[in-house]
Amino acid sequence: MKIGNIELPKTAALAPLAGVADRAMREISREYGACWTVGEMTSSKGLSFGSKKSAELLQIGEAERPTAVQLFGSEPETMAQAAEMAMEYAPEAIDINFGCPVPKVAGNGGGSALMKDPELAGRIVEAVVKAVKLPVTVKFRAGWDSEHINAVEFAKICEDAGAAALTVHGRTRMQMFAPPVDLEIIRLVKEAVSIPVIGNGDVDSPEAAKRMYDETGCDLVMVGRAAMGNPWLFRRIERYMQTGELLPEPTPEERMTVLKRHVELLCKYKGEYVGMREARKHSSWYIKGMHGAAEFRRECGEITAPEDLERLIDRVLLSCSE
């Protein structure tokens, strides 16, 4: 598939996970096979008001490319202004968030709340498309709730407004992340539009990725929560789609080696103080499912320095060897 002039293989992309898909996560994901990444959602109002925190979310390193920055908001002019400001960071595309279900975003008219106002969503897409000379992509859900499944109508409006590609999460806003993803709604969107469609939701294994490809006809799949502490999933999906081979899960040693590198990148980009505190959640994700993981989870929450991480890694590996 192509987003603008960018050709992407039929493998998997990293979703714009808030609080997770930062520079370190995007770089690690690219190293392990993600063909495309989308950064954390960034407030259009925050950018327009000069928020340093919002601007920091847009920073991109060469090792992460190709990548898109993601913006959210409910005002066409503000979204267009934010998109123009994002051009400074030279992303390959601008992604618009019409899918975030969390109350602090949707409750303020952003994210998935726009699914209740397709006409306004279309005006936002049109404004952003006119503001930048980059492909503009859109991420949205099946609908607001089970009584209002409007993804097909919504997709057509976004396409008519100039969107270059669409990402569909096969759940409604009210469903959040709980029930199994609805592959049928992704298939219906794919059949309704002529631009590329990316399927999202429950892609947690190579087999799940292939099933989404096969049952929806989507052009690409996007991995979200399943990539946390598990960047190997991208490589495993890539190999499975290309050859049918199911690569083994990483060894404990491989997991800990990549955890250490991930934390080093966090410290490089955010400084040691912030990086080591963010290492807490990443450590708990990397050790998930390993021998003694429940016992070590408390230690993950106490990490404040590199030596704390080293001790944790040593203890985890010792536990796995027993």
Predicted regions and their residues:
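Glycine-rich, positively charged N-terminal anion/phosphate-binding segment
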Residues: 2, 17-92
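N-terminal small/glycine-rich loop or linker at the start of catalytic domains
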Residues: 1-12, 45-66, 100, 104-108, ...
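Alpha/beta catalytic cores of nucleotide-metabolism and tRNA/nucleoside-modifying enzymes
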Residues: 4, 8, 12, 18, ...
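Alpha/beta enzyme core
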Residues: 80-110, 118-195, 215
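Active-site beta-loop-alpha junctions enriched in small/polar residues
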Residues: 17-19, 42-44, 72-74, 99-101, ...
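Aromatic- and acidic-residue-enriched carbohydrate-binding clefts of CAZyme catalytic domains
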Residues: 115
